[in-house]
Amino acid sequence: DHRLPSIVKVTSGSTPEIAEVVDQLYNQIIVAGTYKAESIRVAEAAKVIENTQRDVNIALVNELAMLFGRLGIDTEAVLQAAGTKWNFLPFKPGLVGGHCIGVDPYYLAYKAQQLGYSPQIILAGRHINDGMGSYVAKQLINLMSLKSLTILNSKILVLGITFKENCSDIRNSKVIDIIEELKNHGANVSVCDPCADKDEVKNILNIDLLPINEINISDYSGILLAVAHEQFLDLNLQLAKDRVIYDVKSQLDIS
């Protein structure tokens, strides 16, 4: 459980004396302890590369998922097999949003470009992850086509609007890219998210959320699990077996 007290806190200060005060302050609440960086610049850089590394790793598995899709290989099966090795990092493909992982790499890239250096891997990762919403929508459309289901005027149910599972934060959520792509192809999209604040979603994204207890699975030609909230994992999808179900996070039991 990665909560504030259980994560080592990197601290620093503008002077050695202030750095010590800050470090002692955090030590009062951080059970895992603190790490006093030698300067604020080092502490800030450490935080930025932490999120950038995660962004790049997710971009790698996203690209692999797109490749395996073309090869007709189950990405989840490949990751499970590769995960038997002690040195394999267990990242999964998915949408990268929020106010940290999808933003911090741009800080680093901007500073690098100010100094005359063009970061290749960082920006390549951002390019891949920023395009995943459109990719997911097109995958759903292609799967519907294979079942002779027309996307124009079809009813699509998108499960989840927040940027990650089991949280209410909608900042920089890439699910909106999926919704817009589906709408651009003429679909009628319903969105359900029991974790999100319906008023906030309406005010910021102009989307009316469908209450989870009003979902009628058989009404939809396509169902897309965008965010793996715990409430969604208990949905009975047996009525949707003749429809298209796209599970971004490979969490649903649709056997």
Identify the residue ranges that each predicted region occupies.
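Structural/interface elements that position substrates and couple domains in central-metabolism enzymes
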Residues: D1-S255
